[in-house]
Every structure is written in C-alpha cells, then in structure tokens.
C-alpha cells in the first residue's frame, strides 16, 4: 500500500509463492527481481521423482494438474517484464539461463555475497569434523532428492574409493 506508493523501486527475492506479490505493485514502480530459479515443480519433473529418479506419480497427470499454476506464473513474469525499468537477475549463470529458457527474460547475475569474516584464518576453534576417516571424501548439503542430484552423486562416486558425507 502506502510504502510502495512512496517507493522509487522494489527489490523482490523470488521464492515459492513470492511472485503473486507483483499483483499489488503499482505499474509505475520499478522492480528488480532476484530470481533464485524458476519454480522447479512447474517447469521440471525433478521434484516429482523419488531420490532414485522413479516418478512419484504419473508425470503426464502431474504436468496437466500444474498447467493452471504454470500459466499463472508465466502471466506474472510477463507482467513484470512489461513494466518499464524492471530488471531480473539470477543468482548464478545457470539461473539466468533458466530465466531466459522459461520466461524469455534477459537476466543478469547478482552473485551471492560471502562474508569472509565467517571463515577465520585460525580453524582451531571450529567444531571437530564428524567424519571419522582421514581419507578424501565428498560432502553433499541439503535434503536427499533427485532434484539435488543425490542419486547421481552416489552413482558417480561408486568405485572411486571416495566416501560420501551427506548433511541435511
């Protein structure tokens, strides 16, 4: 309402369900959308698969059921892209490329910021590594899922002698 009416611009970070906020943005307000990625559930089947890649349900039925949500998402992005002075940035070159593929948006890249103070020079105060071995290992962070490549990682490591530590 009032805050947006007096603002010069709006910075919106996309997330599940944030694009409908665009319905409430005055058309004269410049918007910068930091698009983390187009909604995977609407545009890819990766979220509709088990960790081994097996479909959770019939993928054709899932795609049909999500067609209305996909159209709504496309309409919201088309509305944003038609607003004068509005811009879209991805958080990686991959996200920027996906914005072009999915929405036709020419997106720049706004890299995530890293605070080097979070990583002290002296690691002696760090918690002890929970991995019991002294050999090399691979770390995966996040929920185990097909979308995050968990199964692909396990397959690629098979026979290499590398261990996998999964956190999350």
Predicted regions and their residues:
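Conserved donor-binding/catalytic core segment of Leloir-type glycosyltransferases
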Residues: 87-89, 124-148, 154-167
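Membrane-proximal helix-turn-helix segments that form the acceptor-binding/catalytic region
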Residues: 4, 39, 50-88, 95-97
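Active-site proximal beta-strand in glycosyltransferases
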Residues: 9-11, 25-59, 89, 108
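Acidic anion/phosphate-binding donor-loop and adjacent secondary structure
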Residues: 97, 102, 114-136
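Active-site donor-binding segments of glycosyltransferases and PAPS-dependent sulfotransferases
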Residues: 1-19
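Short, well-ordered alpha-helix to beta-strand connector turns
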Residues: 6-8, 28-29, 83-86, 161
């Amino acid at each position: 309402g009032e805050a947006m009416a007096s603002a010069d611009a709006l910075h919106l970070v996309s997330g599940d369900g944030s694009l409908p906020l665009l319905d409430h943005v005055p058309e004269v307000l410049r918007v910068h959308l930091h698009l983390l990625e187009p909604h995977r559930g609407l545009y890819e089947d990766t979220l509709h698969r088990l960790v081994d890649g097996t479909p959770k349900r019939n993928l054709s039925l899932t795609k049909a059921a999500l067609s209305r949500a996909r159209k709504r998402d496309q309409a919201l992005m088309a509305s944003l892209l038609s607003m004068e002075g509005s811009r879209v940035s991805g958080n990686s070159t991959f996200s920027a490329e996906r914005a072009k593929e999915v929405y036709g948006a020419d997106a720049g890249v706004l890299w995530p910021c890293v605070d080097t103070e979070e990583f002290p020079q002296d690691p002696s105060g760090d918690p002890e590594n929970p991995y019991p071995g002294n050999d090399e290992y691979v770390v995966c962070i996040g929920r185990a899922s097909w979308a995050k490549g968990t199964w692909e990682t396990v397959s690629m490591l098979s026979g290499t002698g590398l261990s996998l530590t999964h956190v999350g």
